[in-house]
């Protein structure tokens, strides 16, 4: 009995504190993404395709979640990429995602198609197609 009373007496004076964790800041390492210029068989749309790709690249970099891979490092051409990416070529330059697309004249409008690929899984994540006037290209770039 004395033994039990001693244990109860000791337990009364034990102070229990919760474990406290303080996280001062998190770090997010930007994901490498390759953003190609939009491919077009029509040379008059080449500059517009470059402008759209540039705006998309700037938007993704400003988010802090992505870092663009320098397009001088690209192995596969835009023309061959419009069919199917060679994922091994993109793994060599250490990119995790690939954003490619095409731009075409469609009467007095343009059609813009984007495809986002996961390089390591070797599959398309998403694909979108937009149709707009040439003057509205910047708005489509921000979508």
Spans of model-derived segments:
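Short, solvent-exposed linear motifs at loop/edge-of-secondary-structure regions
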Residues: 30, 142-143
């Amino acid at each position: 009995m004395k033994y039990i009373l001693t244990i109860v007496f000791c337990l009364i004076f034990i102070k229990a504190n919760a474990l406290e964790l303080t996280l001062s800041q998190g770090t997010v390492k930007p994901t490498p993404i390759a953003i190609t210029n939009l491919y077009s068989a029509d040379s008059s749309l080449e500059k517009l395709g470059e402008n759209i790709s540039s705006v998309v690249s700037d938007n993704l970099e400003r988010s802090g979640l992505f870092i663009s891979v320098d397009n001088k490092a690209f192995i596969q051409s835009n023309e061959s990429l419009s069919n199917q990416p060679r994922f091994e070529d993109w793994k060599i330059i250490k990119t995790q995602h690939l954003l490619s697309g095409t731009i075409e004249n469609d009467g007095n409008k343009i059609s813009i198609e984007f495809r986002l690929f996961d390089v390591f899984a070797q599959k398309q994540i998403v694909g979108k197609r937009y149709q707009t006037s040439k003057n509205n290209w910047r708005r489509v770039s921000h979508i």
